[in-house]
Amino acid sequence: MIGNLSGIVDEVRSDHIILNVNDVGYMVYLSAKTLNACSIGSRVKLLIETYANNRENVAQLYGFISKEEQQCLRLLVKVSGVSYKTAMSILGKLTPEQLFLAIMNEDKVALKMSGLGLKLINRIITELSGKVSKLEINNNNFHPINEDALSALINLGYEKMKAYDTIKKYRPNLDTKDIIRMALKELSIL
């Protein structure tokens, strides 16, 4: 079993990289977000999840830059109907924190993407809603937010994830009006 790989990126493809580790090239599948951060010649260290594809009689390697992202994949593939490829697509769109929020809030819109039907989205929410605490979101990145401020921004027409990412930067004990005002300033600049 491979736990992690550290090496130089030789090739970047649409869904994977060739990672050169001591002159051995490993094909490692990555989420779109992680793939965008890789460039030829850059040095990367990836946590590795190995999937034995019995139909093709090969082992596929999936790489992650964070333990949280790897844990999300492990939870997602336990859901009936979610393949490794589907899980990587989800992680390409949502951070572990956003996935956690979408499952907790039963936000089907946030989980909507190509190849993911409503039945599968409902199954993901149903099967993982009790397990999301296992995501162990890093306490520095995930903290309670002011739900009233989030609701106000959504009602003003901002996308839920964008609003969430903006207001999570502010301490939840600030006055709701102040959080909304600061968030609106930031969102109007973007």
Swiss-Prot record:
The RuvA-RuvB-RuvC complex processes Holliday junction (HJ) DNA during genetic recombination and DNA repair, while the RuvA-RuvB complex plays an important role in the rescue of blocked DNA replication forks via replication fork reversal (RFR). RuvA specifically binds to HJ cruciform DNA, conferring on it an open structure. The RuvB hexamer acts as an ATP-dependent pump, pulling dsDNA into and through the RuvAB complex. HJ branch migration allows RuvC to scan DNA until it finds its consensus sequence, where it cleaves and resolves the cruciform DNA. SUPFAM superfamilies: DNA helicase RuvA subunit, C-terminal domain, Nucleic acid-binding proteins, RuvA domain 2-like. GO terms for cellular component: cytoplasm; Holliday junction helicase complex; Holliday junction resolvase complex. It is found in: Cytoplasm. Pfam families: HHH_5, RuvA_C, RuvA_N. Residues 66-143 are annotated as: Domain II. Keywords: Cytoplasm, DNA damage, DNA recombination, DNA repair, DNA-binding. Its main location: cytoplasm. Has three domains with a flexible linker between the domains II and III and assumes an 'L' shape. Domain III is highly mobile and contacts RuvB. One of its GO terms (molecular function) is ATP binding. Residues 147-190 are annotated as: Domain III. Belongs to the RuvA family. This is Holliday junction branch migration complex subunit RuvA.
